[in-house]
């Protein structure tokens, strides 16, 4: 239960960071996808189910506040969290390369699927323009922010694991 509550608080914090804070630091109208960082981080650190749940909550938040249809972003973030969780077994906390790579790939696929769902299906075939003005800048910006945000998430996760383990040993 603690894991869920802490993850929920981190999702809300990342949502506020992405929508309120980084809005003032947008480069060319692009802000980093902090929600993808927390979704992929949750999956990597806790596994598929936790990543799936974090992705669902994150996606529903985006759907409610910014989506035209409820559920599209939820599905995209759920897939990102689930597939990030597949790498949980080979996750080493001191190695930032794997999580950063998963966040970059997850954000790229997320943006590409958004292009397909929202533009390509409406016969807007400007993939080059969308790639250079939306996808690549957001992925780069997200990667830069992930270098700073991921260690904070990792530290919170490690501290939470220590607290849970200490409280579990009290009852044994």
Where are these regions (language model features)?
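Terminal, non-globular segments
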Residues: 1-172
